Every structure is written in C-alpha cells, then in structure tokens.
C-alpha cells in the first residue's frame, strides 16, 4: 500500500470511529425531530442551519486551512491568529444579535429573531478552542479529536432528547446546537492548553501571508456554501417554511454521507497532501485511492436509499413526510456528486491554490443562483430539485477538468476508479428495489419492508464486493483468524 494511503488509512481509522458514532446519534436525532416537529418547524431548522453554516465559515476566516498548510508559522503569528478568532467570535455574536430582525424579515418568520439570538451565544464560547482544533489536526492527533467530537455530540443529544419533551422542539434544537459547539471549543482548549497557549501579542503586520491565503479560502468557502445553500435560502424566501421543511428533510437525508462519511478521509487527507504538496504523483495516487474508498462506502448508502425511499420515510419519519420521497430520489444525484467532489478542496488547498477554488466556486455560484431563482418561481419543489441536480452535473465536470489542470489527473484513470463501485452498487440497488416492490403485495408494516429490502441489498453488495475485489475476502479471513 502506498505510504500516503497508509497515512490516510491510519488517520481515517480514528475519524471513522468518531463519524460512525456521530452519524448514528444524528440519525436518531433527525428521526426524533421529524416525528416531534411540524413541517413548518422543520423548515425553521433549515433556516437556522443556513445561518449557522455561514457564521461558522466567517469565524474560521480561512485561517484554519492556512495554519495546516503552512510549515513556518511563528509563535507571534499563532498568538495573533488566536486573538483574532476570539474577536471575530464576539463580533459575530453582536452582528447576529443585531441583525436577527433582518434575517426574520427576509424569511417572513418572526420567531427567528429570538432563535437566532440564542444561537449567537455559541460564538462567544466556541472560538476559545478553534485554533487548538486545527493544531491537533495538523499534528494528526485524530484520536483526541474523535473523542472530543463523540463526547460533545452525546452531550448535545442527551440534552435534546430530554428538552424536546419539556419545551418547544425548535428551541430545544437551537440550545442543543449551542451546547454542541461550545463544549467542543472548551474541550479542544482543555486538552491542548498545556502544549501551547497564546502570548498577549497582536501583530497584524506579520500576518500578510495568512491574510493572502485566508482571504481566498474564506471567500471560496463562503461562495461554496452560498452555492450549496442557495436552494434552501430561495425556497424559504419564495415558497415558504412548510415547503422548506419537506425539502430540508430530503436534503438532510441525502447529505448525511457527504457531511459525515467524507470527512473520514478528507479531513485526514488535507494535512497529508499538504506535506506532499510538491509531489503531484503522490497526491494523484492518494486522491484516486481516496475516491475509490469514498465511492465504496457512499454509493451503496445513497443508491440503496433511493431503492427503499418510500419504506424508509414511512418507517422512520411517518406518512406525513411522504411528499419528501420524490425530492429525495432526485437529490440523491446531488449527494453522489457531492461525495465525488468533496476531496477536490483538499487537493487545491494542499497545493496552495485557494485562489482557483474561489474563482471556480464564484462561477458555479452564479450558475446555481440564476438557475435556482428561475426554478423557485414555478413553486414546484421537484422542479427545484431537478435543476439543482443538473447544475451539479455541470459543476462535477468542471471539477474534473480543474484537477486535471492542477495535479495532471488522468480523467480515464479517475473514472476507472469509480466505475467498479458504481456498477456493484447499481446491481445492489436493482435487487433492493425489486425486493421492496415485491413486499408491497403483502400486508407488511413499513418497518418490515424496509428491513427485508435492506438485508437483501446488503447481502447482494457484500457478495459482489468480494467478487469484484478478491483481496477483500482474504483480508476479512485473515482478520477472522487473528481474532
């Protein structure tokens, strides 16, 4: 196994443990909220999530990636970065508190004023540990990062599971998010403060290189997130909270693999790629292996989900959410493409090309914005979903060309790396869909239909996986003997 792939796999082991635990927690949380909330309340969750995403990007300011990418940061620069994070957090709290009526007015939902102000509290606490998080990541301490994230998510969910029965579900959710981000910040600070603590220094003149890289990274991430959330923003503004609730449910389901499974590899890959930034051949090799791993894990989840979408929605969220099924099926295309595009950022940042990422994201944002603005005027969520999927295909193709330019990635080799996982998964999806369709003729509960279909699909996938990758069988047998 190539050295860079070994490093990625080693870090991914700890990150995968964390991600699996967090994903299970969030799926249970998601199901709990789906059953406790109305469609409109779930739409408010989408609005609040959008505000949180943009505020967290601004809090980072692109300096996190700059810190990981650079090998020559001085103590003076590190201290300045730390205090800059603290000041940015305070500024964000004030801005969100003051602008909450504007946000509520945009979405035409008065209740957002109070909710956004509660949410803003996290930006007073989380920044104290943010830089420590990046330093842990840079030094590849993924075991420590994983333990902190698991504990914080368990704490947040434990609170939500109790509070949701004692107060408005939407308020309980917002407070749980404040608790989640704040506890992570405090714990990052607690575990690393003995190794490093900031001096009382604030020297902006020595931060030129950080500002240069960070400005492009911040702009790129803001533009990227705006492009990724423009559908939510426009649906909430022009179609309404109830429609956004339906769309948000479908969107959150298909993006769980993107947001939770991809970082198992990509979070580890960036610092490792950065250490090999002058070796294009090494990055290409690591990138192709990373892409194949992501495809083997994410494809069966997303395509399998489409195969059993009606039974899944009914069993987990209830019949009131069945309107989300056709939206989910279309957005699965977006989810698959996001899985494949997600590693691009690790490569561009490792190569120090935050500028290219910004220009790319800006062009795509314009395309997304104009197309989705036209789509929401129809008032049809399905139209919005299809437009989003088509533009995502265009974005995906642009991304492949960009990687060919930056690291001389051979497109034929790239598509070969994902073709086998796709064909295996497609066969699994057909089997699972056929079983799901067959069980409809029997008087079965949705839960039983779902269980039978998933079991059939999983067995089919494992069988085809061993046939397609014989080395997988030998590894499993070897581990079985060792245990």
Swiss-Prot record:
Keywords, ordered alphabetically: Cell membrane, Cell wall biogenesis/degradation, Membrane, Stress response, Transmembrane, Transmembrane helix
Pfam assignment, any one: Polysacc_synt
Annotated membrane topology: Multi-pass membrane protein
Q: Which CDD domains match?
A: MATE_tuaB_like (cd13127)
Q: Name one GO cellular component term.
A: plasma membrane
What does the entry say induces or represses the expression of this protein? Answer: By phosphate starvation, via the PhoP/PhoR two-component regulatory system.
Q: Which GO terms describe its biological process?
A: cell wall organization; teichuronic acid biosynthetic process
What pathway is this protein a component of?
Answer: Cell wall biogenesis; teichuronic acid biosynthesis
Chaperone among keywords: no
User: Any transmembrane segments, and where?
Assistant: 15-34, 41-63, 83-105, 112-134, 154-176, 294-316, 321-343, 356-378, 382-404, 411-433, 448-470
Compartments it resides in = Cell membrane
> Extra info from the record?
The nature of the anionic polymer present in the cell wall of B.subtilis depends on phosphate availability. Under phosphate-replete growth conditions teichoic acids are present, whereas under phosphate-depleted conditions, at least part of the wall teichoic acid is replaced with teichuronic acid, a non-phosphate containing anionic polymer. The synthesis of teichuronic acid is accompanied by degradation of teichoic acid and reutilization of liberated phosphate for other cellular processes such as nucleic acid synthesis.
What this protein is reported to do is described as: Might be involved in the translocation of teichuronic acid repeating units from the inner to the outer surface of the membrane.
- Family according to the record: Belongs to the polysaccharide synthase family.
Please give the name of this protein.
Answer: Teichuronic acid biosynthesis protein TuaB
**Mind giving the lineage of the organism this protein is from?**
Bacteria, Bacillati, Bacillota, Bacilli, Bacillales
What gene makes this protein?
Answer: tuaB
